[in-house]
Amino acid sequence: MIDRQKVRRTNPTMFSDCELTQMRSSRRDLLFAAPGAIAAAMVSGSSSVRAAAPIARLAGSHMKLSLAAYSFDRYLIKRGTPEQVAAAKMTIEQFIDYCAEINLDGTELTSYYFPIDIPPEYLASLKERCFRLGLDISGTAIGNDFCLPEGPKRNQNLMMCREWIDHAAMLGAPVIRIFAGSVPAGDSEEAARERCVAGINESLDYASQRGVFLALENHGGITSTSEQILKIIEGVKASPWFGVNLDGGNFKTPDPYFDLERIAPYTINAQLKATVFPNGIAEKADLQRVIAILKRANYRGYVVLEYEDQEDPRTAIPTLIQKMRDAIHSQES
C-alpha cells in the first residue's frame, strides 16, 4: 500500500501517474475482496471486520446531477407553520419544480425546509410531484450532532435521525446526509468520537431495516480533516448501509483535494460547491478536478450541487450545473 502521507509531504498538490496507478490497483484489490470478507463475517458472527474498507463498485463510474434545497436557504422557510410556508419566497414544491426546469436528474429535499408537522400525506404529495416531473429524490439531510454526551439533547438527536429515516423511506429517498458533530467544551475528541460512532451504529441498525443509507459528511467539527473522518469510519461496524457524503467544499486543510482523494473510495453520496477553502482561504473550486477524483474512485451515484455563494442562486446555479455536466461528460469520454 502507498504511504499517502509520505506522498503528500513530498508533493503537496498531486499524485504522480505512477502513484495514482498503484493506488487504484490497491483499491481494486480491496474492492473485490470486500464483499466476500463482509459476507464471511456476517456468517461467522465476527466483529473484527469494520466499515473502513472502500465501497465495492460493481462497474465503472457513472454520475447523475441533483441540487440540494439548501442552495435556496435564503428563500426557503425552516420548519415553518403552514402560514409561514405559504408566505415564503419559495416552497419545497417550487424548489422541486425548479429542479425539473433546469433538467436535473434528481432533487435533494433537505429536511430543514419541511414544515413543523409532516403528515404522511405531505410526504406522499412530494413523492408524487417528483415522480410526475421525472425526478428522483436523491436524498435528504439532517443537522444532527452525535458527539453530545448522554442526556436529553443526545436522545433528541438520535430520535430525529430515526424519524427522518422513516421520512426518507416514505419519500423513496435512498440516503440521508448525517453529521458527526463537535467536541463539547471540556471534553476530548477521542470521547466525542466514541459517542459519535455509537450514535451512527445505533442509527444504522434502524436505517438498515428501513432500507435507507446513512452518509457521514465531512462537515467540520470532528470531521474537519480526512484523517478524522477515516478514524470514525474505522470505528463504525461493517454495514452496506453506511458510507461517506463527500462534500467538495468543506475541507479547510492545506490541500482539500488531497483530503477528498482519501475519502472518495468510501463515498456513497457526493456534493460539490462553487468554492473551496485551502488553509481556510476562499478560492474558486476546480469542479473538473473533484469530478476526476470521484471518477478515479469509480463512484456511481448522484453529484449534488450545494450552492452557498453570494450571487443569487437563480442566476448562479444554471451556470454551475452546466459546468458540472460538462465535467462529468468529459470524464466519460
Regions found by a protein language model. Give the residues of each.
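A structural motif corresponding to the C-terminal end of an alpha-helix
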Residues: 98-104, 170-171, 203-212, 296-299
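N-terminal pre-domain/capping segments
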Residues: 15-170, 191, 198, 243, ...
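Conserved, mostly hydrophobic/aromatic
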Residues: 67, 99, 130, 168, ...
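Hydrophobic faces of well-ordered beta-strands that scaffold small-molecule active sites
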Residues: 63-69, 107-109, 137-142, 176-178, ...
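Active-site groove signature of glycoside hydrolases
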Residues: 168-188, 210-219
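Short, small-residue-enriched loops and turns at beta-alpha junctions
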Residues: 115-116, 145-148, 183-186, 220-223, ...
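Short helix-capping segments at alpha-helix termini
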Residues: 58-59, 132-135, 206-212, 235-241, ...
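Acidic/histidine-rich catalytic cores of soluble enzymes
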Residues: 106-107, 197-293
